Amino acid sequence: PGTRPLLSGLYRLCGPVRFALRHYLCADGVIYCEEDLLLLSGLQHFAFCRRQWALIHLEQQWEENLRTVEGSLLHSRAHDASLRERRGDLLMLRSLPVVSYGLGLSGQCDVVEFRASPQGVSLRGEEGLWLPYPVEYKRGRPKAHQADELQLCAQAMCLEEMLCCPIPEGALYYGEPRRRTAVSFSQELRQEVRSITEEMHQFYRRGYTPKAKPSKSCNACSLKDLCLPQLVKKRPVSDYLSQAMEDLS
C-alpha cells in the first residue's frame, strides 16, 4: 500500500510546510520513488542475516517460533493503547507511520514520545516545542550485534527527514529486563544505516538471495527449516561423484 494515507495523521499533526521539506533533507541528494520504498522493519533482518531478509522480503517465506510469537505479543502491547496520549510535558504517539525518501524506507514506530524542548518542533494543536524520542520494543535482552540499534536509528532518520529537526537519541525497551536501553544516534551508526539500506536496495533490485552461512544464530531462527543451513556443511553429491571417478581412473 502507498504511504500517503498512512502518513496523513503525522501530516495533520505537523503541518504541510514542514512535512513537504522532507524531500530536501535526503542524504547525498538521493530520492527514492514511492514504489521503491522497502520495509523499515526489514533493516533489522538484513543486519542480522542477509539470507533471512531475502527469504522473508524477496521469497515471501515465514515461519513462527516461540521467539517470534513473544516478539509479536510485546509489540501488540506497545500498540494496544490509544494512538495519542498526553502525560504532562510528554506526548506519546503509538504505531506512528514514518517514511524516508532518502533512505527508501517506510514503516511504523512502536512509540514516539514528544518531549517539551527548546530544540524541538511545533505540533499542530499543541503549545510549545516538542522533540521526538523514538522507542522500539524488543523481546529478550540486549544483543551482541547492532541490528536493533540500526532499526531504531533508521526510525529516527525517517522522523528527522519528515519533521526537519535533529533527533540525538532514542531507546530500546527489552521484554526480559523490562527497562529501556538508551541509544545515541552517532554519525557512525547513521552511516551504517545508510550503507545497509543501500545494500538492501541492491539486493532487492537484483532479486538476490545469498547462500546460507551457518552460525550459532541459526538455531534460534524461525526460518532454519526453510533455510537449511546444515546442508552447506555437507559435501555436494557432485564432489563425491568427481572423487569416485578419479579413484577409478
Language-model features and meaning:
Residues 1-13:
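Extreme N-terminal basic, low-complexity initiation segments
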Residues 7-10, 22, 45, 214-217, ...:
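Secretory pathway export signals and precursors
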Residues 10-134, 234, 246-249:
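Metal-dependent nuclease catalytic cores that hydrolyze phosphodiester bonds in DNA/RNA
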Residues 33-36, 199-215:
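Short, intrinsically disordered, charge-biased short linear motifs at domain edges
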Residues 46, 57, 77, 192, ...:
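Residues that form generic nucleotide/phosphate-binding pockets
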Residues 49, 209-248:
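Cysteine-cluster motifs in flexible loop/terminal segments that predominantly coordinate metals
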Residues 78-81, 175-186, 244-249:
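Short, mixed-charge aromatic SLiMs
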Residues 107, 113-207, 219-225:
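Nucleic-acid nuclease catalytic cores
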